[in-house]
């Protein structure tokens, strides 16, 4: 019987699944609506107290800080933001840690917005944004002192290659922090995961399988924290925006809201790993 990792590789080679170009074009079309909904970010928020009402910007800021604490870059270090969106998290962590951060995205629209909103407002050379595919990184070996990926691996068909590429551009001893959706099971054997699979490609991986892929790519897993309960209130942000937008995008946001609200089998992991 094929292993889960072998199955993921087969999925990555299946031409019926979306390519990086497809994903980039989706974000070209939806980034404005998503950043408006998520307080300038393109990732969910982190609630310390899920019963407390907070703004999208506050909770988005907090999730970014959770990533930053785990990465803990030193002043002046060069960090890679894998899937930078429109650049808010990139600029935020560069400012907090006085680090140099390069953000990459496969959305041309996101590159333009990031450069306009943050690239020209930060100190010269502190942030840099470019169009690049994480599965084929255009950087030299050991170019970076650390990296993070917030809700970007979930879109990548060949996660093994992406993680190997990230490992290649990191210096030994550097950290990689991942914040992303994961499943408790390797296949959609529950109603919630089945609904997720209907509207998202590629399929989710389990946290265990993601850790195995990290080890195969040359990382040591340091910590895994499941924060599904802390991000669950994000469903209200999707619901509110979906109702206001209407149409196809509005309907998809409402479906995402429903899935997040019922995500007993749908996890959200903060994974800290070290390049060996």
Curated annotation (Swiss-Prot):
EC number: 2.1.1.-
Keyword Methyltransferase: yes
Broadest EC class assigned to this enzyme: transferase
Pfam name, any one: Methyltransf_11
Pathway assigned to this chain's UniProt record: Alkaloid biosynthesis
GO BP annotations listed: methylation
Keywords: Methyltransferase, S-adenosyl-L-methionine, Transferase
Cofactor names: S-adenosyl-L-methionine
Residues that hold S-adenosyl-L-methionine according to the record: 110, 133-134, 155
Superkingdom of origin organism: Eukaryota
Family designation: Belongs to the methyltransferase superfamily.
Protein's job: O-methyltransferase; part of the gene cluster that mediates the biosynthesis of communesins, a prominent class of indole alkaloids with great potential as pharmaceuticals. Communesins are biosynthesized by the coupling of tryptamine and aurantioclavine, two building blocks derived from L-tryptophan.
Name by which UniProt lists this protein: O-methyltransferase cnsE
